[in-house]
């Protein structure tokens, strides 16, 4: 996905689920406990760290700065990608199952604010914000144009083959 490393997506998921009203917090905590057990069952932080280093390195090598999230650009300029990722994994609560389970168990209505300072969440927020502001609008325009052109193509096909019966296909292109 756009985030690459599992910890980045996990940070966004936990934040979203803990950012609920006090009335819904206990239900969210129970759901998160089960999800955390599943997540950490076969999670390997060392592997995830290597993946994140390579992914961010590739961003910086292959994209122009206007296509790189701000957090990634700052990381590259300040410490370098490898040092940034090492710090992220050493300081993130979410890199360790025991710390995450403790965070969930002790969660209060304000716990999500603590996650806002977590380096994995900050990276996730930067990437998601960048995607929402820069990539999604362009992607939506392209998809709209593809839909419009598919309709023109189908109308032309039906006009060329008036005796043929056309059926909708599974992915809704017809």
Residue ranges and their predicted role:
Residues 1-174:
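Terminal presequence/propeptide segments associated with secretion/organelle targeting
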């Amino acid at each position: 996905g756009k985030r690459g490393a599992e910890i980045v997506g996990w940070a966004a998921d936990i934040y979203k689920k803990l950012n609920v009203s006090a009335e819904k917090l206990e239900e969210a905590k129970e759901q998160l406990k089960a999800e955390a057990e599943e997540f950490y069952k076969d999670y390997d932080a060392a592997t995830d760290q290597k993946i994140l280093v390579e992914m961010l390195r590739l961003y910086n090598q292959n994209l122009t700065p206007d296509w790189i999230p701000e957090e990634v650009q700052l990381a590259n300029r300040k410490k370098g990608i490898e040092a940034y990722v090492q710090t992220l994994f050493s300081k993130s609560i979410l890199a360790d199952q025991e710390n995450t389970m403790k965070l969930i168990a002790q969660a209060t209505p304000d716990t999500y604010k603590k996650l806002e300072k977590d380096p994995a969440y900050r990276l996730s927020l930067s990437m998601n914000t960048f995607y929402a502001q820069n990539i999604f609008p362009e992607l939506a325009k392209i998809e709209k144009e593809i839909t419009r052109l598919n309709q023109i193509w189908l109308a032309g096909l039906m006009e060329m083959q008036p005796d043929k019966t056309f059926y909708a296909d599974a992915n809704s292109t017809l």
